[in-house]
A protein has these predicted regions:
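Charge-rich, low-complexity N-terminal segments
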Residues: 1-28, 44
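Residue-level signal for secondary-structure boundary elements
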Residues: 23, 38, 121-122
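Short, conserved beta-strand/beta-arch hydrophobic-aromatic motifs that form part
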Residues: 24, 41-94
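Generic solvent-exposed, charged/amphipathic alpha-helical segments
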Residues: 27-31, 114
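Charged, well-structured alpha/beta interaction segments
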Residues: 31-42
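Well-ordered alpha/beta subsegment
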Residues: 86-122
């Protein structure tokens, strides 16, 4: 858990205006389809911040931020792996990390999220 959630100015300084726009568009797209709890955390060794979408104790996906870079991660559990079987498997599932620089993959991200969990907003 973070002591202080980064504001727009801090995020823009970290990742740049164009990536901050991508971040906001991706968040808006997820928020449009899913009603989730959103949690800010430290980003571990590789990232400055983590912004996680969770519901019922399960993570849907997470966005990550570090200097001049945005990450989008989906972890597919065993059930989802039956539908998707090409990446390395870790103890808690397959970790798919993307580093979007534009919106071109957003519809693919939504399809992957749909494999993990059906949208709960109409």
């Amino acid at each position: 858990m973070l002591d202080k959630i980064p504001n727009a100015e801090e995020m823009t300084a970290l990742i740049g205006q164009s990536l901050y726009d991508i971040w906001n568009k991706l968040c808006a797209l997820i928020d449009e389809k899913y009603d989730m709890e959103c949690l800010w955390n430290k980003g571990g060794k590789a990232w400055t911040y983590e912004y996680k979408y969770r519901r019922g104790g399960k993570t849907l996906c997470a966005l990550y931020a570090r200097e001049n870079c945005v990450g989008f991660m989906i972890i597919l559990g065993k059930d989802e792996q039956l539908k998707f079987d090409t990446d390395k498997t870790y103890h808690d599932g397959k970790w798919l990390m993307f580093e979007p620089t534009d919106t071109s993959m957003f519809q693919d991200f939504i399809k992957l999220l749909g494999i993990k969990r059906k949208p709960n907003k109409k």
